[in-house]
């Protein structure tokens, strides 16, 4: 599991491409039926998510593109805690990455 902080603009679309690697660091690709979930909370103890998305696209190369819509990212400015979880075909769950998510302001509101 890796730690990485992210920054996104409030109310904007956000895409993140994920690669699947084996233990030696070689890219092996995701397969149909595997799942990725992005979730974020302002407070780790709160029961509800501020962002929750399982919207993803599997590319021909075996990469997953995770998508957060403008509705997903239209939350209060500030720092949140996030993680990205991976669910295997066997329903095992692994946290791939976690960190702080900073939601920053925007000027144009469309």
Predicted regions mapped to residue ranges:
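Contiguous segments within soluble domain cores/interaction surfaces
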Residues: 1-110
């Amino acid at each position: 599991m890796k730690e990485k902080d992210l920054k996104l603009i409030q109310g904007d679309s956000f895409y993140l491409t994920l690669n699947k690697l084996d233990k030696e660091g070689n890219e092996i690709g995701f397969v149909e039926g595997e799942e990725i979930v992005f979730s974020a909370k302002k407070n780790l103890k709160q029961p509800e998510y501020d962002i929750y998305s399982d919207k993803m696209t599997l590319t021909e190369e075996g990469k997953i593109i995770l998508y957060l819509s403008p509705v997903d990212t239209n939350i209060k400015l500030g720092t949140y805690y996030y993680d990205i979880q991976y669910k295997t075909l066997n329903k095992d769950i692994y946290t791939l990455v976690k960190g702080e998510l900073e939601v920053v302001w925007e000027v144009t509101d469309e």
